[in-house]
């Protein structure tokens, strides 16, 4: 058996032994959204430490547990703490949570993150709906022997981010009078922030925002046939655009400041997704 799949099955067995809940939407919380759990009607929680072989987040502001519950009447599983490739994990571990949430029953993966704005016109505190992505600078989560039980060897990636879900976000933003931009997200490895020339390269490639997560999770989800949705909170202007040195504290501060609007947008979007599924 594929070692990555064997590890995934052990994690699933740990989950089933402790939790009796089937989510429809999987939500990964980025920086600044960690307390979104307060907006969920919580049924149960499961610490990452209590799942055999599960990778544990080490980043400040990422608590490290699954939350199971309801947003309105929509059953969700929420990752309160994300695992990042730069923490030293293999890429198969980086996407293990995504794969596990699919096995739990989730049909939609809702990705959120804090990202650096690259293109002119981006401002700290903006929201960006991810329409496409660039993941060429980090290892593919599908590298190695294909896990046939999850998906095909050569999956199509021409439309990773579901168009219907994008429309739902835009309608929710309009109803809440929240301005949302659209663009392409690029994932770099981190943990260091980008240099000015790296940012210039990303801009030349057509990226609008840059971060250290999300794209590989989206690939893994698409490989399994999940519908994928992504929103970035532009927490800072990338290196070379602003003269202010970058820091994680700045990222967290901006994300925290816009968290109420971000949480409202996430809630309205999930409610609309639930209505569409019914």
Stretches found by the model and what they are:
Residues 134, 138, 144-191:
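Histidine/lysine/aspartate-rich catalytic loop segments that bind and position anionic ligands
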Residues 101-105, 203, 222:
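Non-catalytic positions within long, well-ordered alpha-helices that form the structural scaffold/packing
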Residues 150-161, 187, 199, 255-267:
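Polyanion-binding loop/helix "lid" in catalytic or ligand-binding cores
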Residues 212-250:
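Zn-dependent metallopeptidase/amidohydrolase metal-coordination segment
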Residues 1-157:
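Metabolite-binding pocket within alpha/beta catalytic cores that recognizes anionic/polar moieties
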Residues 107-108, 208, 227:
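Short acidic/polar active-site loop segments enriched in Thr and Asp
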Residues 166, 171-208, 266, 273-277:
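Active-site/ligand-binding-proximal alpha/beta "capping" segment
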Residues 239-278:
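His/Asp/Glu-rich mid-to-C-terminal helical/loop segments that flank catalytic regions of hydrolases
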């Amino acid at each position: 058996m594929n070692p990555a799949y064997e590890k995934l099955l052990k994690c699933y067995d740990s989950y089933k032994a402790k939790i009796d809940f089937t989510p429809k939407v999987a939500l990964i919380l980025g920086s600044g959204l960690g307390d979104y759990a307060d907006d969920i009607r919580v049924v149960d929680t499961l610490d990452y430490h209590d799942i055999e072989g599960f990778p544990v987040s080490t980043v400040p502001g990422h608590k490290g547990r699954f939350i199971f519950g309801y947003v309105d009447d929509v059953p969700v599983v929420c990752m309160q703490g994300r695992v990042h490739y730069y923490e030293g994990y293999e890429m198969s571990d980086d996407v293990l949570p995504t794969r596990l949430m699919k096995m739990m029953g989730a049909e939609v993966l809702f990705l959120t993150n804090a990202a650096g704005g690259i293109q002119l016109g981006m401002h700290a505190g903006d929201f960006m709906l991810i329409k496409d992505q660039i993941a060429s600078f980090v290892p593919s989560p599908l590298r190695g022997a294909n896990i046939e039980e999850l998906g095909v060897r050569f999956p199509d990636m021409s439309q990773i981010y579901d168009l219907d879900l994008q429309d739902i976000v835009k309608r929710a933003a309009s109803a809440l009078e929240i301005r949302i931009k659209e663009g392409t997200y690029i994932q770099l490895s981190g943990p260091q922030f980008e240099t000015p020339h790296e940012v210039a390269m990303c801009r030349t490639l057509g990226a609008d925002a840059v971060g250290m997560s999300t794209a590989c999770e989206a690939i893994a989800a698409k490989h399994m046939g999940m519908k994928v949705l992504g929103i970035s909170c532009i927490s800072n202007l990338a290196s070379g655009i602003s003269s202010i040195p970058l820091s994680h504290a700045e990222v967290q501060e901006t994300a925290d400041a816009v968290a109420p609007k971000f949480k409202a947008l996430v809630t309205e979007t999930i409610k609309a997704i639930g209505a569409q599924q019914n």
